[in-house]
């Protein structure tokens, strides 16, 4: 078997770093608001360390090792000592700093966008040399060597099952033990449905106990099994296996989260914020998902806060079963000017929903107008920083209480800095350079509010339906609806691993479809010729992402998509290519070297609108009715990467990879309490600045010992041979 292409798994030394600036927005806060934001940020940063435990068996040790390295001395001293030793070059040290940055930016050694492994871009012996000449090693050689020996091989391993996240022998995950397969996931899913449990805040451990297969569903909480407070349920026999629901996952880290949420509560601006934080604390303390749902309800009702935040086990993209949430937390300040535009969009939402192509019976009975704000991010912890969010993800709350939309205003322009658009004509490159930021703002606004915020799920609870089973007609069959969500079903539990890419595709299509509306473009400050250019750029950018970027996130070996948004955009491109009439074309202009994407802008409002509209009807009908089989068949067809025909994407992938640009890493601020106010620190937009920001983020080495103890607790489930104790390092 050929060796894997290292460029797919490394961050190059020229990786760009950009500052996520929010100084003006933060400095405009009162002292009380700054303290509120600071303690929420601390809770988010501590909680973000949970992601290392959720990513791979070795990730907690990698964090502990690199955190010891960068806190024992300055980056400049680390660099100077390594180079002067003669055992490492300046390029070697740069490669290490970029690797460290990649680990910290993704909260683990797998990319948050794409799920592929991150390995150092320098030889193992050179990295070891830098570690052994460091101040951290001089201070405690036994601890550093113990950590290095425990994770060095895993850091560099690119065995097939280590290259990407996934089940069992096909990938790496810590949401499940390695002996779990898709069948195990389905069995556990059925058990959880029967006993009304959801997967957001748990992991699954499978082992033998007294000769019987046992599935341990371990809930995230501060409290452990031995604590007196009553817990969920006793051991249960289901399908001949023992099911054991326990708690105490990430206990020490969640204790730090709760301590900071308690402090933040002292500076809350109203009862809704206090009640929200109280419920989050209860959830993280006890493992109760209902408490987090309650906190989310308070959060939705807290309209237009000056400091916005959300925290918990949220997005399910990286669970191979699509049910378990990765921890994330964000803190941000409202951008009033941009928020006014989103407020106007919300005011028009009900009329815009009527323009969507599915029948009104497939739309929610009542549109609950959400809070929609543009935010300047102060803190975002997790495996990546999105451009926009539509939360909470709990189906029952979204249908009955509503949701919130946030556009991360300082993320959007930052993400376009220094970017080159390949595979386009010079005229289209100029169009993207001029209008891409505005077009993306339009797309994000529509995607979050009316994409994720639209559509009804048909449900049956007992003998009651939430739709008229006698009169509602399926537009694809012209007959009555014959499928729906039963009691205990959620979108995630039914659509599982398909769910994320499918829902992102639906939201992206809504954004494209409604970007044709002149009133929408006017809300975003564009009219006339400029509005037409923004509309064209919105479509061009989506189709460019589907053709020029998406296949970076596809694995030919496993024939598996590694990233939901990338798969969604590729599917949209295929739908538009299928529409014909020379609406969209991709040609190989230089054999094996270059491609050209062209979009006939005169046909967007005709051919393009019809193609996306017809596709949207199918997407929504299958989602509303829970028709996973039809959804899977359709989506798999458009997701196929073929190596023949008019568009040999499997062959063209090598051309796309040859033009690949490194993904940016965003440098965030730190805050620190000084008396009755809070100081904010900024850092250079470099690898050195990024690493420095992390070296100053936590006030003690306690986080290292907590992660090491969590690794030790789980090690027996993830290693064939019991690893060495880390007592020397703890």
Give residue spans per PLM region.
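Long, well-structured alpha-helical subdomains associated
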Residues: 51, 490-505, 509-622
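Active-site recognition of the HExxH zinc-binding catalytic motif
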Residues: 30, 270, 439-461, 507-508, ...
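A generic secondary-structure signal for well-formed alpha-helical elements
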Residues: 44, 69-73, 265-268, 272, ...
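N-terminal-proximal low-complexity accessory segments that begin disordered
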Residues: 2-77
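Short, glycine/acidic-rich hinge or "gate" loops at secondary-structure transitions
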Residues: 79, 83, 271-278, 461-467, ...
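Contiguous, non-catalytic segments that form substrate-binding/exosite surfaces or channel walls
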Residues: 97-101, 106-224, 228, 239-440
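Post-HEXXH active-site segment of zinc metalloproteases
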Residues: 455-503
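Extended, compositionally biased alpha-helical segments that mediate assembly or anchoring
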Residues: 596-730
């Amino acid at each position: 078997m050929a060796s894997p292409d290292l460029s797919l798994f490394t961050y190059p030394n020229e990786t760009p770093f950009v500052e996520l600036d929010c100084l003006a927005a933060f400095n405009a806060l009162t002292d009380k608001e700054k303290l509120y934001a600071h303690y929420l940020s601390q809770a988010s940063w501590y909680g973000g360390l949970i992601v290392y435990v959720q990513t791979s068996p070795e990730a907690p040790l990698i964090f502990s090792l690199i955190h010891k390295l960068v806190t024992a001395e300055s980056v400049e001293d680390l660099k100077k000592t390594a180079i002067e030793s003669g055992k490492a070059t300046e390029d070697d040290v740069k490669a290490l700093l970029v690797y460290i940055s990649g680990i910290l930016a993704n909260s683990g050694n797998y990319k948050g966008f794409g799920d592929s492994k991150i390995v150092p871009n320098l030889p193992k012996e050179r990295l070891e040399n830098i570690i052994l000449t460091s101040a951290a090693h001089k201070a405690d050689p036994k601890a550093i060597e113990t950590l290095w020996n425990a994770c060095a091989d895993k850091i560099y391993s690119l065995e097939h099952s280590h290259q990407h996240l996934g089940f069992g022998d096909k990938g790496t995950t810590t949401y499940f033990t390695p002996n779990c397969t898709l069948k195990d996931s389905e069995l556990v899913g059925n058990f959880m449905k029967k006993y009304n449990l959801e997967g957001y805040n748990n992991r699954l451990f499978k082992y033998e106990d007294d000769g019987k297969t046992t599935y341990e569903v371990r809930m995230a909480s501060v409290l452990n099994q031995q604590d007196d407070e009553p817990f969920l349920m006793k051991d249960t026999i289901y399908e001949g296996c023992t099911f054991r629901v326990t708690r105490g996952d990430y206990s020490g880290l969640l204790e730090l989260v709760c301590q900071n949420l308690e402090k933040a509560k002292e500076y809350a601006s109203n009862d809704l914020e206090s009640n929200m934080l109280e419920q989050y604390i209860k959830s993280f303390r006890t493992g109760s998902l209902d408490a987090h749902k309650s906190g989310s309800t308070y959060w939705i009702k807290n309209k237009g806060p000056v400091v916005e935040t959300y925290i918990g086990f949220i997005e399910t993209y990286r669970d191979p079963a699509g049910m378990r949430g990765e921890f994330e937390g964000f803190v941000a300040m409202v951008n009033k000017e941009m928020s006014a535009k989103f407020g106007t969009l919300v005011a028009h939402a009900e009329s815009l929903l009527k323009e969507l192509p599915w029948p009104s019976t497939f739309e929610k009975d009542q549109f609950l107008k959400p809070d929609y704000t543009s935010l300047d991010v102060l803190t975002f912890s997790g495996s990546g920083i999105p451009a926009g969010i539509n939360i909470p993800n709990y189906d029952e709350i979204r249908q009955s209480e509503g949701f919130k939309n946030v556009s991360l205003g300082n993320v959007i322009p930052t993400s376009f800095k220094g970017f080159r658009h390949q595979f386009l004509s010079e005229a289209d490159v100029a169009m993207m350079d001029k209008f891409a930021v505005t077009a993306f703002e339009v797309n994000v606004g529509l995607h979050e509010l009316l994409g994720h915020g639209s559509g009804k799920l048909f449900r049956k609870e007992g003998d009651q339906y939430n739709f008229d089973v006698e009169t509602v007609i399926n537009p694809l069959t012209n007959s009555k609806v014959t499928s729906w969500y039963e009691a205990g079903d959620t979108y995630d539990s039914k659509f599982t691993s398909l769910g994320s890419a499918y829902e992102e595709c639906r939201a992206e299509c809504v954004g494209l479809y409604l970007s044709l509306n002149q009133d929408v473009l006017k809300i975003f400050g564009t009219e006339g010729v400029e509005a037409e250019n923004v509309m064209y750029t919105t479509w061009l950018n989506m189709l460019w992402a589907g053709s020029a970027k998406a296949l970076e996130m596809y694995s030919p070996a496993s024939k598996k998509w590694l990233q939901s948004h990338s798969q969604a955009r590729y599917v949209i491109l295929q739908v538009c290519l299928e529409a014909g009439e020379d609406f969209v074309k991709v040609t190989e202009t230089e054999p094996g070297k270059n491609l050209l994407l062209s979009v006939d802008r005169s046909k967007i409002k005709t051919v393009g609108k019809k193609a996306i509209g017809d596709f949207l009807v199918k997407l929504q009908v299958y989602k509303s009715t829970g028709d996973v089989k039809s959804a899977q068949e359709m989506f798999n067809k458009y997701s196929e990467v073929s190596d023949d025909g008019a568009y040999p994407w499997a062959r063209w992938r090598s051309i796309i990879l040859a033009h690949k640009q490194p993904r940016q890493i965003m440098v965030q601020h730190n805050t620190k309490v000084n008396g009755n106010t809070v100081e904010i620190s900024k850092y250079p937009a470099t690898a050195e600045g990024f690493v420095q920001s992390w070296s100053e983020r936590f006030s003690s080495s306690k986080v290292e010992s907590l992660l090491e103890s969590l690794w030790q607790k789980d090690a027996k489930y993830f290693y064939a041979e019991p690893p060495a104790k880390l007592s020397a390092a703890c």
